[in-house]
Amino acid sequence: MPEICPICGLPKDLCVCEEIAKEEQKIKVYVTKRRFGKLMTVVDGFDADLIDVKDLAKKLKDICACGGTVKKDSIELQGDHRKKAEEILIKMGFSKDMIDVR
């Protein structure tokens, strides 16, 4: 007997909770300056209960070819990757209207 998702009530292999959550996230992408003048792209605004932030960070780091980390519910990427991060998030299923790039 397959496991049932507690949120949507569907079997785990048919669960659509993460897909629905991706469309509802209000994401902010911005650049900050860190120690020694280095730039850091911050992708913020994820609901960690619904989206696997660590897996998303790994995919962003692989595609952007940079280092980075996950702090609380935000992803930090080394360098200025605002445009590339926005394109990647849109391809992953996040709504273009809900992504705010500064």
From Swiss-Prot:
CDD domains: YciH_like (cd11567). One of its GO terms (biological process) is translation reinitiation. Keywords: Protein biosynthesis, Translation regulation. SUPFAM superfamilies: eIF1-like. One of its GO terms (molecular function) is translation initiation factor activity. It comes from the Archaea. The keyword Protein biosynthesis applies. It holds the Pfam family SUI1. Belongs to the SUI1 family. NCBIfam families: PRK00939.1 (NF002096), SUI1_rel (TIGR01158). This is Protein translation factor SUI1 homolog. It comes from Methanococcus vannielii. The lineage of its organism: Archaea, Methanobacteriati, Methanobacteriota, Methanomada group, Methanococci.
